[in-house]
Amino acid sequence: MARLQEFYKEKVVPGLIEKFGYKSVMEVPRITKITLNMGLGEAVADKKIIENAVGDLTKIAGQKPVVTKARKAIAGFKIRQGYPIGAMVTLRGRAMYEFLDRLVTVALPRVRDFRGVSGRAFDGRGNYNIGVKEQIIFPEIDYDKIDALRGLNISITTTAKTDDEAKALLASFKFPFRN
């Protein structure tokens, strides 16, 4: 069992029950999945970009991402339907908790001028999104071997019904909120 998973069961669940007054353990919000998405519009010109991005996401997530394709053609962006334009990976279970652990303890503190993540990035339904500008904040990525700096979106999906519950859940995982 992952370190954060044990921490969730032993410390987070009792803390949230006390704070929000849940009657059942099953009411306590939990993280269901973490989705990493890398949009690569520049991949239209060069197919190598997709391969490099897939390699980077594989190292970061620990599992192979799926290449996302354009749903419809957009002439202004020179994209045809079916063109590979991104990569995404969904983490659940043990891999999800291990990634969250690495994100909070190692990766986020490596961001330049890091003061904490925004507490306003919730979607109104208890899910949280973080945009990362550079993939080199993850220790798995070797700075000398990357071809370009690419950003990615990290989406944390929870079972929380409100943003306050989700923020309390993530804060109990030592998420560094600045507000």
Curated annotation (Swiss-Prot):
Gene3D superfamilies: 3.30.1440.10. GO terms for cellular component: ribonucleoprotein complex; ribosome. GO terms for molecular function: rRNA binding; structural constituent of ribosome; tRNA binding. Pfam families: Ribosomal_L5 (PF00281), Ribosomal_L5_C (PF00673). GO terms for biological process: translation. SUPFAM superfamilies: RL5-like (SSF55282). Keywords: Ribonucleoprotein, Ribosomal protein, RNA-binding, rRNA-binding, tRNA-binding. Belongs to the universal ribosomal protein uL5 family. PANTHER family: 60S RIBOSOMAL PROTEIN L11-RELATED. Part of the 50S ribosomal subunit; part of the 5S rRNA/L5/L18/L25 subcomplex. Contacts the 5S rRNA and the P site tRNA. Forms a bridge to the 30S subunit in the 70S ribosome. This is one of the proteins that bind and probably mediate the attachment of the 5S RNA into the large ribosomal subunit, where it forms part of the central protuberance. In the 70S ribosome it contacts protein S13 of the 30S subunit (bridge B1b), connecting the 2 subunits; this bridge is implicated in subunit movement. Contacts the P site tRNA; the 5S rRNA and some of its associated proteins might help stabilize positioning of ribosome-bound tRNAs. This is Large ribosomal subunit protein uL5. It comes from Burkholderia multivorans (strain ATCC 17616 / 249).
